[in-house]
A protein has these predicted regions:
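Short glycine/threonine-rich loop-to-helix capping motif typified by GTGT followed
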Residues: 52-60, 102, 187-192
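A conserved regulatory-domain signal marking ACT and ACT-like small-molecule sensing domains
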Residues: 92-95, 119-233
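Conserved phosphate/anionic-ligand binding catalytic regions in large, soluble enzymes, centered on
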Residues: 9-27
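Contiguous domain-boundary segments centered on the initiation and propagation of an alpha-helix
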Residues: 67-117
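Short, hydrophobic/aliphatic alpha-helical segments
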Residues: 1-11, 41-44
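A structural-propensity feature for long, helix-poor, extended segments
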Residues: 42, 46-85
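Generic secondary-structure signature for well-ordered alpha-helical cores
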Residues: 13, 29-39, 67-71, 85-89, ...
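Protein-protein interaction/assembly regions in multi-subunit complexes
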Residues: 26, 68-71, 76-78, 85-87, ...
Length: 233
């Protein structure tokens, strides 16, 4: 359901909610999912992001988000200078994508430790975004919920183990999807929750058998959530 704040648009540094606010959120999402400071960002622009994005500040907004800035950060117009100051290398190019939204960015990120992440996401209007792919695996989430991204071995029991533990600590699953490249390979669980998930909960989940990594995206206006009741584990 659309509310009055969706119609008014986000608080942001302009000029465009799609090309600027949404782009900043995409960059910020990439930084969060990488899990560390970005050392290098190779950024592909598709559709109107490529055609008119530079005039609307899409490039600066993406860089700003990758530096951890929110859409209303007054430093966004100076994002190139901020990136250079932070020692973050970057490049931009036009890309062709199949069946993608016109306002789509492809981020190929390398962190300070050498960790790598590829993220494809679209800005769909009013500052809202949709994440389409992570490391080439199809996903579909918006960042409007607290979100767990779980990379696991594609074997029976992995999904049940995660959801069982979330249930034990009274964390309600709002939406969930599981995608994979192929049977028996790596898979991605995307779990959107109503409650906040604490760092020690994320760490506990990451240590379960068959779980390769767990990344947590905390929505901006998150509320305090339930803690692990260790007596139940």
């Amino acid at each position: 359901m659309i509310n009055i704040f969706d119609m008014m648009g986000p608080v942001m540094v302009g000029p465009s909610s799609s090309h600027t606010a949404g782009a900043a959120r995409i960059g910020n999402m990439g930084r969060t999912l990488l899990g560390e400071e970005v050392a290098r960002a190779d950024i592909g622009l598709y559709g109107s992001f490529a055609e008119t994005g530079y005039g609307h500040g899409t490039d600066r907004a993406l860089l700003a988000g990758l530096l951890g800035m929110k859409p209303d950060d007054l430093r966004i117009p100076n994002a190139y200078e901020e990136a250079n100051r932070a020692g973050m290398a970057y490049s931009f190019r036009t890309v062709e994508l199949c069946d993608a939204h016109p306002n789509t960015a492809l981020l190929e990120l390398t962190g300070k430790s050498g960790k790598q992440l590829t993220l494809q996401a679209s800005s769909i209007g009013g500052g809202a975004i949709v994440v389409n792919k992570i490391d080439g695996i199809d996903v579909n989430f918006t960042g409007d919920f607290n979100t767990l991204i779980v990379r696991n071995q594609d074997e029976s029991g992995s999904v049940a183990a995660i959801t069982s533990i979330l249930s034990q600590v009274h964390i309600n699953v709002a939406n969930m999807s599981v995608n994979r490249h192929r049977r028996g390979g790596d898979a991605l669980m995307v779990i959107e929750t109503d409650q906040h998930i604490k760092p020690r909960q994320v760490e506990f989940l990451s240590e379960l058998p068959g779980i390769l990594s767990v990344t947590y995206y905390d929505k901006e206006d998150d509320e305090d959530g339930a803690g692990f009741d260790e007596g139940n584990l």
